[in-house]
Amino acid sequence: MKKNVAKTYYVYILECANGAYYTGITTDIERRFTEHKTKNKGAKYTSAFGVKNLMAVWKTKKCDNPKSLASKLEYRIKALERKDKEEIIANKKAFKIIFMNNFEFNSFIRFF
C-alpha cells in the first residue's frame, strides 16, 4: 500500500533584472530557478524582465497540507511593502517579527 507522503514546498523570492522582487512556490527550488533563468517555463513576469538572483528561500516543515501553507505565505509576502521584503531577505529574524501573529507561519524554516 502506497503511503501518502506530504511533499516539501519552498517559498522563494527572486530579484529580477529590473530590480523588482518576484515571489513564488515550488517543490524543487533548483529546477524552478533554472526555469526562471532560462525563460522557457518561467512565469510571465520573470520571462519578460529576467532574473538576477535568488534572494531567499523558506522550506515547509512537516505539516498536513504544505502546499496550502506555502501558498498562504507566498500571498502574504507578495502583499508586503518592498521595505519589509528587503528586511526579511536581509534579516532572518525579521520573518518571525513580521509574521509573529500568524502561528501557522512557524511551520517554515529559512532554507537559503
Describe the residue ranges of each PLM region.
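GIY-YIG nuclease catalytic motif and its immediate N-terminal context
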Residues: 1-41, 50-74, 92-112
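Charge-biased low-complexity segments
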Residues: 47-53, 80, 87
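Short arginine-rich
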Residues: 40, 75-90
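Basic, flexible Lys/Arg- and Gly-enriched helix-loop patches that mediate nucleic-acid binding at interfaces
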Residues: 44
